[in-house]
């Protein structure tokens, strides 16, 4: 966009974000989303056409790549149909867990009838999209990632890492781009893929569009101002079981958070507490998910819990994870120990009905995502339970109070065990 120095300065201020640091003494992180091409010529993100001054001529060079879409084989629920009808341009769909974002996203792709790229950031998420494409269209999707480069067909599902390395090859190939778990778009890897794409339609999907680090302020830059938030539905209401443990979580601002978590997860009493809880809820008929961000802790707890368990961490190859989780979904295993990074987003094991928080959490979006793993509807599934272990110490009490406040805000019943 051609502009005067005054206009450039105004837009630069509008598109520069100061993100507070975790430490009050550290300077804020600066995110600048205006690019200077040369003197008097700038580039702004596609979602911020509102910053273009009046009187400017806008030449739309976005790509329309029309393709023949197969018929969508299913009916949408009324709330999904409403979102489907509303989508005419770029948008964010901020839908509660289990609402059906993947399902509705594919219906929208069929409505727009453009060659479509689905962007995912993990192999399991990519595989879920591939399966959903087969289910709703009865076709195979193209795949980009894990050594594959197949752009044939109306829908292609790709991994961010491979797409990022090949931006020049894909930026003019698609007419619609859908970013799953779009709250990651503040990361340069994701934002470059979205911002570089010439696709006419850009749709972001997420269950949580607030980030604890405050970077959600940039979301509209890439998807515009239209945020569609359908009602919460199609989920089971969980009950919160609060377990006072008597185990202390270290206090002290001079002790790094990571060191405090490590000390907790190396505490033998804590390991036995988590393991016994997992075994107890499995004995009641639940399929149990225990999450933590400490791999050795998960391994130790799985060993203590017994043969009824599987453990899925980053050390497990992608091709083995599905066969392991199938032992929970279809087999005889009842307890799944897994890392937060893997199981916080999008992984659908619908018969999971009990979540045990193995690591202290003070992040509301993360808590929402994790609880989402156990509240999906399934026939004959036990009423879901979230097990919240309360620890001693000022930090632990403050964080537990925040979680209790979140549960109360949702209107969920709490029981102290």
Label each PLM-derived region with a short phrase.
Residues 89-112, 117:
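Walker A/P-loop
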Residues 164, 314-410:
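Conserved RecA-like P-loop NTPase helicase motor core
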Residues 109, 252-293, 299-303:
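Conserved interdomain hinge at the start of the Helicase C-terminal
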Residues 127, 131, 139-152, 165, ...:
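Conserved helicase ATPase core of P-loop NTP-dependent helicases/translocases
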């Amino acid at each position: 966009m051609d502009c005067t120095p005054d206009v450039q300065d105004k837009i630069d201020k509008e598109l520069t974000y100061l993100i507070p640091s975790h430490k009050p003494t550290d300077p804020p992180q600066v995110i600048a989303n205006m690019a200077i091409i040369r003197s008097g010529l700038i580039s702004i993100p596609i979602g911020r056409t509102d910053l273009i001054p009046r009187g400017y001529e806008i030449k739309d060079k976005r790509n329309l790549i029309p393709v023949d879409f197969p018929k969508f084989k299913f009916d949408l629920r009324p709330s999904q149909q409403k979102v489907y009808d509303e989508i005419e341009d770029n948008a964010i769909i901020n839908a509660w867990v289990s609402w059906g974002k993947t399902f509705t996203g594919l219906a929208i792709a069929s409505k727009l009838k453009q060659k479509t790229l689905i962007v995912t950031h993990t192999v399991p998420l990519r595989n879920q999209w591939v399966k959903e494409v087969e289910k709703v269209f009865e076709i195979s999707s193209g795949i980009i990632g894990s050594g594959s480069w197949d752009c044939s067909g109306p829908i292609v599902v790709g991994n961010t890492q491979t797409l990022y390395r090949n931006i020049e090859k894909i930026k003019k190939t698609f007419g619609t781009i859908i970013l799953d778990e779009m709250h990651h778009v503040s990361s340069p890897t994701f934002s470059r893929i979205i911002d570089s794409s010439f696709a006419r339609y850009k749709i972001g999907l997420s269950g949580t569009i607030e980030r604890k680090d405050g970077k959600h302020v940039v979301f509209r830059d890439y998807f515009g101002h239209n945020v569609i938030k359908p009602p919460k539905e199609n989920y089971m209401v969980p009950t919160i079981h609060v377990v006072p443990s008597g185990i202390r979580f270290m206090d002290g601002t001079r002790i790094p958070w990571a060191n405090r978590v490590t000390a907790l997860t190396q505490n033998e009493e804590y390991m036995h507490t988590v393991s016994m809880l997992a075994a107890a809820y499995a004995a009641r008929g639940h399929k149990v998910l225990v999450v933590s961000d400490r791999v050795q802790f998960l391994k130790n707890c799985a060993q203590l819990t017994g043969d009824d368990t599987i453990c899925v961490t980053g050390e497990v190859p992608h091709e083995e994870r599905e066969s392991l989780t199938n032992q929970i979904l279809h087999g005889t295993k009842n307890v799944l120990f897994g890392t937060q990074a893997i199981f916080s987003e999008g992984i659908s094991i619908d018969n999971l009905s009990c979540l045990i928080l193995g690591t202290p959490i003070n992040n509301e979006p993360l808590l929402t995502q994790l609880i989402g793993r156990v509240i999906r509807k399934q026939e004959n599934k036990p009423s879901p339970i979230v097990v919240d272990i309360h620890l001693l110490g000022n930090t632990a009490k403050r964080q537990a109070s925040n979680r209790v406040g979140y549960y109360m805000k949702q209107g969920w019943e709490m029981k102290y065990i």
